[in-house]
Amino acid sequence: MKILLLLSAMLFPTLALLGCASPPTDQPAASTVPPAPVVSPEPAVKPQPRDVLKQMATYLRSLDRFTVRVEKTTELILPTDQRLHADQTAEIAIQKPNRLRVNFQNLSGGRQLFYDGTNFSLYTPEANVYASAAAAPTLDETLDLLANQYRISLPVTDVLVANPDSRLAQNLTSETYVGRILVGGVPCHHLAFRTPEVDWEIWIEDGPRPLPRRLILTDKSVEGSPQMAAALTDWDVAPQFATDLFAFNPPPNAEKISFVDEAPAAK
């Protein structure tokens, strides 16, 4: 089964406040060169890729809420064989078991997705229009509903579900521990996996917070084997959410419309 790394986006960047003080006059000023990241040496025995994947999944399951920013690039292959790349940025906020908010960003104002455990709504601020429908009782079921029935895709869905290791590890034909590398200044385990239809790589933070930091997927089932790459940044694993963050209240004069791309219901 092909891995579904669905796109769209949500999350809120974290701001850090850095304090500083003037050095004593009888001492030299501190260097302005930032310290290099502390990177532990390569392990004597390479970890098993599936074990690292399970550590990530266990940690994500332990979080009752989080936010993340996803920047995704999808490769498109034209009939002329020219390759184009479409970018998407999403900020995602999740509160388990059944709350979701996604802000899809673009130059025209983007879109906003709300899921409050009962209904979901998609709002386009520029046009001041929205559509709403009944949702499933859990986040996993709602993500599947959005993708399969309404054709609303979120980025990196497979790492947002309750059991990401089970979904990601389906139909594996090989797994490789590539090594350790810095991703955005963060030491990460680089893992590579293959299935009959998809080759995919994942970079997982090394340390007490095994968070996914980067994903690359190569779709071998499509001629030309296009790729999708996603960077997951600005993780906040203990955010404070406003009480109304996940509830959609239509703005004044907003027009309610139907989901024009709704797929036929399964019989």
Task: Enumerate the language-model features and the residues they cover.
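Bacterial Sec signal peptide processing site at the extreme N-terminus
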Residues: 22-38
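An acidic-aromatic
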Residues: 22-23, 93-155, 221-228
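Flexible, processing/modification-adjacent segments and terminal tails
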Residues: 44-52, 123-187, 193, 249-252, ...
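N-terminal mature ectodomain segment of secretory-pathway/periplasmic proteins
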Residues: 37, 41-129
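C-terminal motif of bacterial Sec signal peptides marking the signal peptidase cleavage site
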Residues: 18-19
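Gly/Pro-enriched, hydrophobic low-complexity segments
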Residues: 71, 121, 168-263
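Bacterial N-terminal signal peptides that target proteins for export
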Residues: 1-8
